Amino acid sequence: MALKTFELRKQSQENLAEQLQELRQELASLRVQKIAGGSGSKLSKIKTTRKDIARILTVINESNRLAAREAYKNKKYIPLDLRQKKTRAIRRALTPYEQSRKTLKQIKKERYFPLRKYALKA
């Protein structure tokens, strides 16, 4: 029977690593039996074992990434694989702060020649 992911998430890292080792050994023995000419039920068990290994690795990687995110939460620089995935154009675009900056000449021009407002008499 296949493992349930929600049950795997409750387990500790050591327990998951131990389970992963057992499944890998089981997969190796199933592959040997396949070469030796095992029955059909053994061959179908290879698929479920591979999927179970993938589930365990997914849960382990998920928890590792979550721990890394917590570690880098308030840091200035975050590793590339933990950063938010954006398009290349968005990553290279100016930040709101950079967009709002003005040159000294522009500041003086706005100060000394403000936009004139006109009221129309109806």
Curated annotation (Swiss-Prot):
One GO cellular component term: cytosolic large ribosomal subunit
Protein name stated in the entry: Large ribosomal subunit protein uL29
Chief location: cytoplasm
Family annotation (HAMAP family): Ribosomal_uL29
Subunit structure of this chain's protein: Component of the large ribosomal subunit (LSU). Mature yeast ribosomes consist of a small (40S) and a large (60S) subunit. The 40S small subunit contains 1 molecule of ribosomal RNA (18S rRNA) and at least 33 different proteins. The large 60S subunit contains 3 rRNA molecules (25S, 5.8S and 5S rRNA) and at least 46 different proteins. uL29 is associated with the polypeptide exit tunnel.
Subcellular location: Cytoplasm; Nucleus, Nucleolus
GO MF, one annotated term: mRNA binding
Keywords carried by this UniProt record: Cytoplasm, Nucleus, Phosphoprotein, Ribonucleoprotein, Ribosomal protein
Function: Component of the ribosome, a large ribonucleoprotein complex responsible for the synthesis of proteins in the cell. The small ribosomal subunit (SSU) binds messenger RNAs (mRNAs) and translates the encoded message by selecting cognate aminoacyl-transfer RNA (tRNA) molecules. The large subunit (LSU) contains the ribosomal catalytic site termed the peptidyl transferase center (PTC), which catalyzes the formation of peptide bonds, thereby polymerizing the amino acids delivered by tRNAs into a polypeptide chain.
SUPFAM superfamilies in UniProt: Ribosomal protein L29 (L29p)
Biological processes annotated in GO: cytoplasmic translation; maturation of LSU-rRNA from tricistronic rRNA transcript (SSU-rRNA, 5.8S rRNA, LSU-rRNA)
Modification Phosphoserine occurs at: S12
Pfam family for this entry, one: Ribosomal_L29
Cross-referenced InterPro entries: Ribosomal_uL29 (IPR001854), Ribosomal_uL29_CS (IPR018254), Ribosomal_uL29_euk (IPR045059), Ribosomal_uL29_sf (IPR036049)
Family per record: Belongs to the universal ribosomal protein uL29 family.
